[in-house]
């Protein structure tokens, strides 16, 4: 069993900053806006002697709440139940706040081991401001500045490592090794789309639990949330992302950062589910996202959600329209589903696995050369300045995505339509599905024949 530690506290006390410091990532959003973290954010923290813990960042616990914030607090209470240890963060600059008495009462209800972490001590000279936190009645207290990395080593060495050694007396190295191996081979699947297209609802349907906050309010998910699952003996990591909304003249820092993280999530994922709202059909934003995914070289599966809103005649027209607009994604499967009613959602895994396997497929040089020659025989390259462009050799430069390198004479003069013809021919002949192919042309060089000079 891997120890689970949860970070709780009011909004803007530095939970996400400490999460990022301990996990050595930027997986949690950090900015000087209260209430940015809404869902549970999971991360790994590696300690000394190969010890490893799961760290959970949570939404701030405050008094005045709107509906979404109430749901976020419910997520925090679930995280407390999951935890073996609680790091209760407070803000030294604000001093002791009334909410913190309520939070400490809630913690005691669950009878969880707790360390009070007094954050943002940098620049604080008033000892009285810090000392008043002792009235909360916690035995173990550590003063830190997460943003300045002050007191972090003491927190780890004085409290976290001894607690793990005491609580988990059995060696956890074997479990950690297994967990790391599972993490390595898990297929990372990112759920990408405009706000409110049903990304979180789809993940909840797959997980069969309310792990993501779902609401009709656009922008409910502000961060990229990763959840590991196993389906048909295959390991997956499902990544929910903030919706990539249309560009606005005014967009604050943390919304912009969420969009950036969505694009970063695409980069670090294996397969992307591009989710489209059937009731809104496709727009420029969907096409832009699709274009970005293609250029990233990631596998792509198109998911058209909310099909339950239409009758069969209407749905047929919508299918034809969407397929027409996305014809440049001819190599990708398009699924028409209802995440809310869980219709067609588990068929997605077949396409996800197919896309992933094809992206890593090793294609022999002989197969590529043979395919290229068949393509040339059916449609020869154009003639430039009285000489026909010659394509001589082809080999696989890399996989994930498949990158085919073609050598020949005057290849720099190949037209875009002919390049597209070759790409389409390779797709159809090699039966590659769900992943983009990249072709690179090199002039007059055979990589397998050395010069005899």
Swiss-Prot record:
PROSITE patterns: G_ENGA. Gene3D superfamilies: 3.30.300.20, P-loop containing nucleotide triphosphate hydrolases (3.40.50.300). Keywords: GTP-binding, Nucleotide-binding, Repeat, Ribosome biogenesis. The keyword GTP-binding applies. NCBIfam families: GTPase_EngA, small_GTP. GTPase that plays an essential role in the late steps of ribosome biogenesis. This is GTPase Der. The lineage of its organism: Bacteria, Pseudomonadati, Pseudomonadota, Gammaproteobacteria, Enterobacterales. The gene is der.
